């Protein structure tokens, strides 16, 4: 059952989200995250966050396949996606517009990974292919939603980089087990509210 969940098809989804590391004045120089974290813009909240970016690759059911923590800049996110995709040769990688770029596309082609992103230009009518891409992208968005809401990713309370890595790994393990349990009992894969504990 686990092998079926992890190795289902060639489809992989990649995205990143900012994880706040500290939010007090002077945190950039006095925190244990100094030298690792920096300021980055979070478009979903319309604010700047001092922290790191979690880059996650998941399969089409939402099971995490790999992750990396990088600085919050877009270039670092692309490098992390390339490093994570190197273990996914022969797969089709769905990403949002932030991963669009000829350099990343060419680098992924060298390791036999096809990158699929939304159309770069807004079209008057959304073609069926763009709607299908958006539906597939909802899977990774729901994974991040579960991590942030049910598993309180943004309230990790980590004081060091090692502590942050440990807390993220715990949440990803809990997410994977939740998806696995849902598959065993026939529930929707990412419906984790029953395991919330609230």
Which residues fall in each region the model found?
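A general structural signal for well-ordered alpha-helical segments in protein cores
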Residues: 77-81, 140, 144, 170
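Structural motif
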Residues: 44-47, 157-168
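Polybasic low-complexity intrinsically disordered regions
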Residues: 1-114, 120
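Helix-centered, glycine/charged polyanion-binding patches within enzymatic domains
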Residues: 92, 97-163
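Residue-level signal for secondary-structure boundary elements
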Residues: 6, 92, 155, 181-185
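C-terminal domain-tail junction helix/linker
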Residues: 166-198
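A generic secondary-structure signal marking the coil-to-beta-strand transition
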Residues: 9-10, 136, 143, 169
């Amino acid at each position: 059952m686990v092998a079926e969940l992890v190795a289902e098809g060639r489809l992989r989804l990649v995205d990143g989200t900012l994880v706040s590391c500290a939010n007090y004045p002077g945190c950039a120089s006095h925190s244990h995250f100094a030298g690792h974290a920096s300021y980055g813009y979070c478009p979903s909240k319309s604010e700047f966050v001092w922290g790191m970016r979690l880059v996650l690759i998941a399969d089409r059911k939402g099971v995490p396949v790999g992750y990396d923590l990088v600085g919050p800049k877009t270039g670092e996110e692309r490098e992390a996606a390339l490093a994570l995709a190197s273990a996914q040769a022969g797969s089709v990688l769905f990403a949002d517009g932030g991963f669009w770029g000829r350099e990343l596309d060419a680098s992924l082609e060298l390791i036999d990974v096809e990158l699929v992103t939304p159309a770069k230009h807004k079209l008057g009518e959304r073609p069926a292919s763009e709607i299908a891409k958006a539906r597939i992208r909802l899977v990774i968005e729901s994974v991040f939603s579960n991590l942030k809401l049910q598993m309180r990713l943004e309230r990790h309370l980590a004081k060091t980089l090692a502590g942050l890595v440990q807390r993220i790994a715990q949440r990803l393990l809990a997410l994977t087990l939740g998806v696995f349990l849902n598959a065993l009992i026939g529930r929707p894969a990412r419906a984790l509210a029953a395991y919330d504990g609230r």
